[in-house]
Amino acid sequence: MGQKVHPHGIRLGIVKPWSSTWFANTQDFADNLEGDFKVRKFLNKELASASVSRITIERPAKSIRVTIHTARPGIVIGKKGEDVEKLRNAVSKIAGVPAQINIAEVKKPELDAKLVADSIASQLERRVMFRRAMKRAVQSAMRLGAKGIKVEVSGRLGGAEIARSEWYREGRVPLHTLRADIDYNTAEAHTTYGVIGVKVWIFKGEILGGMAAVAQSEQQPADKPKKAPRGKGRK
């Protein structure tokens, strides 16, 4: 049987950045890696209802900087920033160094594979028909500008005795094209019949110029207002 490589892993350093960006000596590397794992595990558990897409970690000069990408920043920040302060103290305690937490808003959650997968999983747990949940996610993504999307669910679908897989695709999802910007993620729906796995691939377009183009797009301010062209006036 043909197997699929992880779309993010094969594109690291080509069009996908690392989720942890730091350098360490040989003796510190394992401790830093374990610290990153514990921080991510803690934040994903604490912010399970906050629609967290991804968590990036930097370690400048004996400190840790955590950026939480979320579709619901208000829940993460809390009233007058109380919740984010609690998170900062907890992360600092886990990592053993001073912590800084930044919040980045995900503008279009319908185009984020993690959030789409979580949404489908939560619908399956609420006994929504799996075909309806898949079709709704695909239509929303295509309406908001995705070039293509594929959704796959597997398990005891609809309470069937025998587990099976079903998938739905719209547009194109070129997994072999390394310059293709493909967002991929998974989720699990824990139902009364058992666990149902959800996989989502979203193709957002091709990135020309590699990591330099990715870095430039991240530095540019989002939704910069465009100036209206001036009229030529009367001749």
Curated annotation (Swiss-Prot):
InterPro entries: KH_dom, KH_dom-like_a/b, KH_dom_type_2, KH_sf_prok-type, Ribosomal_S3_C_sf, Ribosomal_uS3_bac-typ, Ribosomal_uS3_C, Ribosomal_uS3_CS
Family annotation (Pfam families): KH_2, Ribosomal_S3_C
One Gene Ontology cellular component annotation held by this UniProt entry: cytosolic small ribosomal subunit
Keywords annotated in UniProt: Ribonucleoprotein, Ribosomal protein, RNA-binding, rRNA-binding
Domain KH type-2, first and last residues per copy: 39-107
Known function: Binds the lower part of the 30S subunit head. Binds mRNA in the 70S ribosome, positioning it for translation.
Record's subunit section: Part of the 30S ribosomal subunit. Forms a tight complex with proteins S10 and S14.
HAMAP family linked to this entry: Ribosomal_uS3_B
Protein's UniProt name: Small ribosomal subunit protein uS3
Organism: Haemophilus influenzae (strain ATCC 51907 / DSM 11121 / KW20 / Rd)
Lineage, highest ranks first: Bacteria, Pseudomonadati, Pseudomonadota, Gammaproteobacteria, Pasteurellales
